[in-house]
A protein has these predicted regions:
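Flexible helix-coil transition and linker loops at the boundaries of alpha-helical arrays
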Residues: 46-55, 86-95, 134, 138
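Structural signature of alpha-solenoid helical repeat junctions
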Residues: 18, 23, 56-57, 63, ...
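Intrinsically disordered, low-complexity terminal regions enriched in Ser/Thr/Pro/Gly
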Residues: 312-726
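Alpha-helical segment of the N-proximal tetratricopeptide repeat
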Residues: 18-51, 66-72
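Amphipathic, hydrophobic N-terminal targeting peptides for secretion and organelle import
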Residues: 84-87, 98, 102
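Sec-dependent N-terminal signal peptides
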Residues: 2-11
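Residues within mature, well-folded domains
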Residues: 63, 70-76, 80, 92-95, ...
């Protein structure tokens, strides 16, 4: 690295200055016009003090890297900033300029080899929000990062951080904002097995792309940046244009006050892979930043304002119809929302052309009948028009009908006004559906790998030491493990068609701030031959121990091809993956004076089981009536009575939603049962068995189990729900 700096030494004569601060100011003054000369000055500064930080300009290494960047030596600039960050970190410092420049440039260049380090530096920037010495200049540098974060944060988290106030007022209004945002980002990490936060890296890559393509120098991010950061690259991106010869001849040539350059620029984005309602029209007026709008925002306002029955109003109506037909044609090609209205507009615009041609032909027929002495040779255009007139004949004049399009016949101005009014209502309704159905954030992380559908059920139990033990059972059908088209393609590329599989399940145990405490891993082989029959895999157990407060769990299940050609066999390409989060789990109450109860653990009831459980765990959310269902639970902190025994009542309530049949609403049916028990231990282990045979019309079922301590009078309850299939 320092060889690089020596290579920048372009002169053996020191500048006529007598301090590092003066040298630094001299170098800054040379930018951006003279980066090579500035680099020479900055090299001298860092050779004397590599960590020099100016009170006014910040770290000298930032400015040296900036000079290299302007000299198109991006790789050297990034390497220099990396070294600078490490040197300053050794002294407990973070230079905001270096950190911000490094994060921006890494992700703007999409330098994936540096994504991990870039994400770490970004988190250091967020941590600065808790620094009491944070100043306005630092907040100004953090502004784009905070703005992009505000687009994806859940509203509750944004409100807790008062992110809107932080962005607008450029001052911290709530304590612990940095810790809150860092904890939230840790919660978004989808793959606990890796050391990197892939979702954070994806976000920063999107922000880097937005900084490159969707930023106005004066006004910052436009609305395209917001949608891109939220949803990623669109399935289809179309630049909307009305620049074609037909419109020039039919519209712009006839209206001198209306010019092509006056029309707003437009883009149409479609996210078909997310939701059918995920479609966005962006409009840029007068070269201002793109903003979300509708197709009607792409028309000049003065064109829409004067539509009426007058000659001028009819002329504007015909122009609006033709421009809308062109725009709707481009929109309808990419989204069905605009299809029917495009048909109406295109049909009417075609009729306008035919009407004009008919009028033109009639005029030429009359002209032909009036002119008896024509020259032997006519110019080509006159001859063409006369030929057309003779072919068309004289159209019927008067009593002219307008195209009904299945509706009442309308002249141009009424048709245009109706199309505009109905179109605006239609697009407003589409925007409402979009707000309702399109997720706030969409990730593309797993698009290159098939999903692995698994069933999961967890239950919390209280251990003797007062900590909570969480038992997580998962399973999947044989069909779920079968490779799909994408997985088969990967198997073919690896030459492993017909291979068996290795399934790795990892349970990440996280503390309240989403820091990973422990990883629990289990692996099992899945044989290709076993997947040809119907059935499900035996439930696999993963267990987390030692929790005492708020905690979080993440389950990651990955399916690999198993390469048996090596000894020992090794995992091949990744074929399928799933990641499931369990946020904000609360440890059970360890206070011995408070009655407590475990979660309900569903079992496939088998009284012949010799295990501690009367059956095998049933992790599926759906039931059929042939499933012998049992619910196992444990009771803690029962109170001894005068006879040195515990006395408690267990009741359960089954709420079934049954199909009402033809013309009848679904109805809810409830059944209740109570049993009194006594024991000699403060901890009891119980289970109840449910008979599903009578649930012939049930569509869903909810079971509430209540335990009441007859000595202390305390009560505790747990609930579990299932869907029921015939």
């Amino acid at each position: 690295m320092w060889g690089l700096l020596l290579g920048l030494w372009l002169s053996s004569v020191n500048p006529p200055v007598d301090s590092l601060e003066q040298w630094l100011q001299q170098g800054v003054a040379l930018l951006p016009e003279h980066p090579a000369q500035a680099a020479t000055v900055f090299v001298q500064v860092v050779q004397i003090d590599s960590t020099y930080i100016s009170p006014r300009h910040g770290a000298a290494l930032f400015w040296l890297g900036q000079s290299l960047w302007l000299l198109d030596r991006q790789e050297e600039a990034l390497a220099l900033w990396e070294r600078g960050l490490a040197l300053l970190q050794q002294r407990g410092w973070v230079d905001v300029r270096i950190a911000d420049a490094y994060v921006r440039r890494v992700f703007m260049m999409q330098d994936r080899s540096r994504y991990g380090r870039g994400a770490q530096v970004y988190q250091q920037l967020l941590a600065l929000l808790d620094d009491p010495a944070l100043d306005t200049a630092t907040l100004q540098l953090l502004q784009p990062h905070l703005e992009a974060l505000s687009w994806i944060l859940p509203p509750a988290i944004a409100a807790r951080a008062d992110l809107a106030g932080l962005i607008q007022q450029k001052r911290i209004t709530r304590p612990g904002v940095g810790r809150l945002l860092l904890a939230w980002w840790r919660s978004q990490d989808p793959l606990p097995v890796t050391r990197r936060n892939e979702r954070l890296e994806e976000h920063l890559e999107r922000v880097g792309y937005a900084l490159t393509h969707f930023v106005d120098p004066d006004e910052g991010f436009d609305d395209r940046a917001r949608i891109y950061v939220r949803l990623g690259p669109p399935w289809r991106r179309v630049r909307l244009s009305v620049s074609n010869p037909w419109l020039r001849r039919k519209v712009f040539a006839r209206m001198p006050t209306l010019m092509e350059i006056q029309l707003p620029r437009g883009e149409f984005w479609v996210y078909r892979h997310i939701n059918r309602d995920a479609q966005y029209v962006f409009v840029s007026r007068d070269n201002k930043p793109y903003r979300l709008g509708t197709s009607f925002d792409l028309l000049p306002s003065r064109l829409l304002s004067g539509i009426g029955a007058t000659t001028r109003g009819q002329e504007k109506a015909r122009a609006a119809i033709r421009i809308l037909a062109e725009l709707y044609g481009q929109l309808a090609t990419n989204h069905p929302l605009f299809g029917l209205r495009y048909q109406d507009l295109a049909t009417y615009a075609l009729w306008l052309d035919e009407l004009e041609l008919a009028e033109e032909t009639a005029n030429w027929v009359r002209l032909r009948s009036q002119v008896t002495d024509l020259p032997d040779e006519l110019d080509p255009e006159t001859q063409r028009r006369l030929n057309m007139a003779e072919m068309m004949g004289v159209p019927v004049m008067g009593g002219m009908r307008y195209p009904g399009l299945g509706l009442a016949d309308q002249p141009p101005h009424l048709f245009a006004l109706r199309m505009i009014q109905e179109g605006k209502i239609e697009e407003d309704e589409a925007i409402m559906r979009r707000e309702e159905h399109v997720p706030r954030v969409y990730s593309n992380l797993f698009e290159d790998v098939e999903p692995l559908p698994v069933a999961v059920r967890l239950a919390r139990f209280l251990d003797a030491d007062g900590t909570t033990r969480t038992r997580l059972y998962w399973s999947a059908s044989n069909k779920a493990f079968q490779p799909g088209k994408l997985a088969q393609k990967r198997l073919r590329e690896a030459g492993m068609i017909g291979a068996d599989f290795l399934v790795t399940a990892t349970l990440a145990q996280r503390d309240e701030a989403y820091r990973t405490r422990t990883l629990h891993v289990r692996r099992q082989q899945v044989w290709q031959a076993d997947l040809n029959t119907e059935g499900v895999a035996a439930p696999m157990l993963l267990e987390a121990r030692g929790d005492t407060g708020l905690y979080h769990l993440v389950l990651q299940v990955s399916q690999f091809a198993l390469n048996r050609a090596t000894q020992p066999p090794r995992p091949g390409p990744l074929l399928k993956i799933t990641s499931i989060r369990f946020d904000s789990l609360q440890a059970l109450n360890a206070d011995p004076s408070v009655l407590e109860m475990s979660d309900l653990l569903p079992l496939w009831y088998d009284p012949a089981q010799n295990d501690t459980l009367p059956g095998r765990p049933y992790p599926f959310a759906r039931l059929t009536r042939d499933v012998p269902l049992a619910l196992y639970f444990e009771i803690y902190h029962l109170t001894f009575g005068a006879d040195d025994r515990t006395h408690y009542e267990v009741s359960y309530e089954v709420r079934r939603r049954e199909e009402g049949g033809l013309l009848r609403r679904d109805r809810e049916v409830q059944t209740t049962s109570r049993t009194v028990y006594e024991g000699t231990d403060r901890t009891a282990r119980e289970y109840i068995v449910l008979d599903l045979q009578d649930w012939k019309k049930a569509r869903s079922v909810e079971v509430v189990v209540r335990v009441r301590d007859l000595i202390s009078g305390q009560e505790v309850a747990r609930t579990i729900a299932f869907e029921v299939r015939s």
